[in-house]
Amino acid sequence: MTDKRKDGSGKLLYCSFCGKSQHEVRKLIAGPSVYICDECVDLCNDIIREEIKEVAPHRERSALPTPHEIRTHLDDYVIGQEQAKKVLAVAVYNHYKRLRNGDTSNGVELGKSNILLTGPTGSGKTLLAETLARLLDVPFTMADATTLTEAGYVGEDVENIIQKLLQKCDYDVQKAQRGIVYIDEIDKISRKSDNPSITRDVSGEGVQQALLKLIEGTVAAVPPQGGRKHPQQEFLQVDTSKILFICGGAFAGLDKVIANRVETGSGIGFGATVKAKSDKASEGELLSQVEPEDLIKFGLIPEFIGRLPVVATLNELSEEALVQILKEPKNALTKQYQALFNLEGVDLEFRDEALNAIARKAMARKTGARGLRSIVEAALLDTMYDLPSMEDVEKVVIDESVIAGQSKPLLIYGKPEAQASGE
């Protein structure tokens, strides 16, 4: 390596690539009859990085997991919902297989299959979408349908969803086009009424209309810094036909719509089959029978439903399932709090009756798995506040009375003989 000075021959040295002299650059690296400056080295590194980015998607496509592998991975993080996991595994596999084969197979154009998840709050809709994105190593973003409005009205534009996806992958368009978008609370943008109104429904049917093209597939022009505040910026062209859209919602009341259809179809009169009240299907059984006509009656427009051909229904979680969620998944809530306490050098034990009490409390609140953390947090708050200031605590035990708020966690101290001798 030569420094910014003349070599032994007294000649001024120049970069063999850009022609700059040794005085115009910070470093000049010498080889056999050739020189390269630090600026050209940086440029070469940039070119290599760009090529690696272009090759990376091909590596991802060649390692596409099978539906069985996708289902197995979901089982590690999501308890229950077996049918929904199977539907998702097949839909996701087919979507990325379509991308790998360039949207066509033997001259047949492969259609896009977006997904609609229906099920009560806390049943695992968001977790399923997040887990899929992690498994496939693709960009993932979430949007709340209740914040969206038609373009030109106060609120979040539909195109901002793609903006968020681009932000997740540092504005790499190719990477964003392989991403997953989860739109939550999709049931909240149902049409407010079957009758046309003088006032425009900008947050209901209007948003459904705005989402149509985005979900079906269009080339969206998205400014790199968001919004329409900087019209002079160069827009990024994103093909949304390659993005997988998953829409989810609780659809409260949809079971009644389905029940009306099912019961009406049973007929009336002398030849009708009379059903006892005990024969009525549960909410979960009814939701599993959902048809497009039910969603239309609920308030989604036919064109929007047509863009979501794959429908998966998640059931309300039972007490047993909630207990499993508390202790079985890889990132189970009890394991997370035990890891936190271990950082203080303390063991944390949840007794079985405590886990059942947590599950019953979540069911009473109708928050599903989403409400489990707040219940555990409330039970452990005082202990987590005091523990860092306490000495010789070896173990904390949580039983049913702690969850019910009737007593404090049991603290087990170590070194009793040392404490006795100190007294």
Curated annotation (Swiss-Prot):
Disulfide bonds: none annotated. Zn(2+) binds at residues 15, 18, 37, 40. Residues 2-56 form the ClpX-type ZB domain. Signal peptide: none annotated. SMART domains: AAA, ClpB_D2-small, zf-C4_ClpX. One of its GO terms (cellular component) is HslUV protease complex. ATP binds at residues 120-127. GO terms for biological process: cell division; proteolysis involved in protein catabolic process. One of its GO terms (molecular function) is zinc ion binding. Keywords: ATP-binding, Chaperone, Metal-binding, Nucleotide-binding, Zinc. Component of the ClpX-ClpP complex. Forms a hexameric ring that, in the presence of ATP, binds to fourteen ClpP subunits assembled into a disk-like structure with a central cavity, resembling the structure of eukaryotic proteasomes. PANTHER family: ATP-DEPENDENT CLP PROTEASE ATP-BINDING SUBUNIT CLPX-LIKE, MITOCHONDRIAL, ATP-DEPENDENT CLP PROTEASE ATP-BINDING SUBUNIT CLPX-LIKE, MITOCHONDRIAL-RELATED. Belongs to the ClpX chaperone family. NCBIfam families: clpX (TIGR00382), PRK05342.1 (NF003745). ATP-dependent specificity component of the Clp protease. It directs the protease to specific substrates. Can perform chaperone functions in the absence of ClpP. This is ATP-dependent Clp protease ATP-binding subunit ClpX. The lineage of its organism: Bacteria, Pseudomonadati, Pseudomonadota, Gammaproteobacteria, Enterobacterales.
